[in-house]
Amino acid sequence: GLTVEGEGGVLTFIARQHFSKVEGAFDSVLLVCGLGTRSVRDAALSAWLKKMAGVRRLGAVCVSSFLLAEAGLLNGRRATAHWKFGRELAKQYPEVRVEHDPLWVKDGNIYTSAGLSAGIDLALAWVEEDCGVGLAHEAARELVLFLRRPGGQPQLSVSLASQASAMMSIR
C-alpha cells in the first residue's frame, strides 16, 4: 500500500492503491482531505475527479471542496467549505457560488460540507436518502450525536457562542 501522512503528522494512512488505479462503477464518492488540499494543483487528480462526476453523488468534506473547484466541477454551482476557508475558496475560484453559512450544500449530484462534523451531518443525510430517516436516526444514536443537523443550519453556532460567553463570565 501507499503511505499517506495525515495533517500535522499525527496520523498515517495506508492506501490500498493510488486514486488513478481505482476503476469500476461507483454509486457515491466522498472526498475527505487535510488542509494542504487547498493548494493542490494536480491535473491527473482533476481528470480522475471529472470521471467520477458521473456518479450519483459526489461529495467533499471541508477543504476537499477546493479539489472539486480545481477540477472545474463546482463552476456555476453552489458550494460551501469550512468557515475559515470560504473566502479563500471564493477568491481562488470566482466561478463557484460559495455559500459561507450552511453546514452542507447540495447542488445537483454534488454535495459539499463545511467541516468534519458537518461531514457527519452530510453522511447521515446520505443514509437518510438511501435508507430512510429511521436508519439515519439510528446511526446518529450509535455515533452518540446530540442531534442531527440539517444542511441549511449555520456553521457558527449561536448556542456554542452563548456557552463560551457563559464559561468566560464564570472564570
Q: Each predicted region: which residue ranges?
A:
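Short, surface-exposed amphipathic charged segments that create phosphate/polyanion-binding patches used
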Residues: 9-14, 94, 113-114
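Predominant activation on well-ordered alpha-helical scaffold segments within soluble catalytic domains
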Residues: 50, 90, 120-124
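A conserved active-site-flanking secondary-structure segment within enzyme catalytic domains
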Residues: 75-103, 138-139
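Short beta-strand and adjoining strand-loop segment in the mid-core
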Residues: 68-83, 110, 127
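Conserved anion/nucleotide-ligand pocket segment
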Residues: 103-142
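Extended, subdomain-level signal for the structured scaffold at the beginning of enzyme domains
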Residues: 1-58, 66-70, 100, 128, ...
